[in-house]
Every structure is written in structure tokens, then in C-alpha cells.
């Protein structure tokens, strides 16, 4: 998959995640919000990508699950699997883990307030910020961006 193809998938995934947030905002309980807050705190203690990334994946999965919409969840997970290596790469360096987790905290706050509009916007923006972090990370890296199954758009030509 090329970086350009991954960027397109990020766009679709962002809006699915936003929809999941809108749906979850009307359904979450105080217990759900506390659980999500605990997950954010645990991610805040992660010292590196190897400890942060699985927690991040679990947090996103829980958010999508809280939407109550199995089709949104199915599509979101499928897109996430396609982007696995890109998502991980986008969280490496430049304070990306800290920024990502600050965005997670804003998502939890919007859910706590049951604000569907804000939750949708915050969750969409979170994925788009991840896309931006990835694109900044791979900019100018050329062939070394490639990992098994990943190619830059120039390599696809």
C-alpha cells in the first residue's frame, strides 16, 4: 500500500470514527467515561511506542464499541487493519504519543458531556491529526518508508 492510498483510508476512517463518537455520546454512562479516563491515564504512563500502541488500539476499539453500531465497528476495524503499520509509524517521534493522548482526553471530555457534535468533531480531528503526523513523519524519507507491504507512491509508479 502506498502512502497516498493510506492517506485516503485515513480520511474514510476519520469520518467513521466521528460517526461512532456521535452515536456513543448519547449512549455512554458514567462508568464508560470512567473506564475511558482510566485508559487515557494508562496511556499517559506509557514510555514508548511498544507500550503505548496496544493501549491506543484498545482505546479506539472501546470507543467504537460504545457506538452500539456493529456495521460502523466492522468497517472501522477493517480500515484499521489495513493501516496498522502506518498507524504505528505515525506515533513514533516528535511527541506524537503525548499529542495523541491529549486528543484522547478531549474525546473523553466531550463524551462525558454527551455532546454529540463535539464528540464527532473531536474524534474525526483525532484521526486526521494522526494522518498529518504520519505524513510529516514519512515526508522526504523515500524508499526507507517501505516496510513489508508498504510502498511510497513513487515506488508504485
Role assignments for model-derived ranges:
Residues 1-26, 65, 135-157:
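Short linear motifs at protein or domain termini
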Amino acid at each position: 500500500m502506498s502512502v497516498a492510498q493510506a492517506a485516503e483510508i485515513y480520511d474514510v476512517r476519520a469520518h467513521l470514527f466521528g460517526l461512532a463518537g456521535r452515536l456513543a455520546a448519547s449512549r455512554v454512562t458514567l462508568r464508560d467515561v470512567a473506564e475511558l479516563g482510566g485508559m487515557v491515564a494508562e496511556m499517559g504512563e506509557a514510555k514508548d511506542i511498544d507500550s503505548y500502541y496496544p493501549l491506543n488500539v484498545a482505546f479506539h476499539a472501546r470507543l467504537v464499541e460504545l457506538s452500539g453500531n456493529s456495521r460502523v465497528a466492522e468497517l472501522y476495524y477493517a480500515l484499521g487493519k489495513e493501516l496498522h503499520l502506518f498507524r504505528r509509524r505515525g506515533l513514533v517521534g516528535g511527541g506524537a504519543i503525548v499529542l495523541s493522548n491529549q486528543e484522547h482526553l478531549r474525546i473523553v471530555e466531550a463524551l462525558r458531556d454527551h455532546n454529540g457534535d463535539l464528540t464527532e468533531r473531536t474524534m474525526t480531528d483525532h484521526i486526521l491529526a494522526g494522518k498529518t503526523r504520519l505524513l510529516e513523519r514519512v515526508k522526504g524519507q523515500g524508499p526507507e518508508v517501505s516496510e513489508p507491504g508498504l510502498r511510497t507512491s513513487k515506488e508504485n509508479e
